[in-house]
Amino acid sequence: ALPIWNDHFYGRNGESLGALSVEELDRIRGQEKKDWSKQIVPEARIEHLDTNAISLARENYKKKMNKSYISEEVDRMTDEQFLTKLKLMINGKITNAAMLLLGNEDYDYLFKTVPEASWRVYDSKNEVSDYEIFKIPYITLSERLFGKIRNLTYRYMPNQLTLFPTETKQYDMWLLRELLNNCIAHSEYTYGGRIYLNEFEDKIILTNPGSFLPGKIEPVLNPG
């Protein structure tokens, strides 16, 4: 429950509490009412999931937990038991999260709005010179998207005391992966838009449908 004082709802604002705006309050109430990831895809069945994606999820889970007895337990589970353990299936039903992460792209029409991601590369005139659209399963989205990026190697001389140049990649792939994961986690999938990875000659811009922050970003960048 949100704290109330003097007829105002309050929420965290940095290190202190501040009165919530109507927009912020509506967003919080909306989040409390429904969680898209936990909603059921009515016509989806476990047969509509990608078996390779499920196998990858099993391996990722065992690697993350890093305990032999958990790995053995996971190996004994059926796919339904494993997905239920991860709360990707609820009462035998497929959730949006399960379909998004592990779904077979042939059945993406089972979503009310089909989730997609797109890579676009821009030339020196800021015109799209190439593109590709990516569908579910999103568990492999980062590998598929990042396989398109031209991550050039730069070589430079750090100082005059060495004969060998230092090599560095144009982009930090770990950082890009974190940014993409945030795009996936904070997308508003009910809008039906795409996640875009726009690659320019000197930068990459990631965008997603929906909004991460309420209102405009200027007050956040310039709080004074």
Region roles according to the model:
Residues 1-224:
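Conserved N-terminal catalytic/coupling substructures associated with nucleotide/phosphate chemistry
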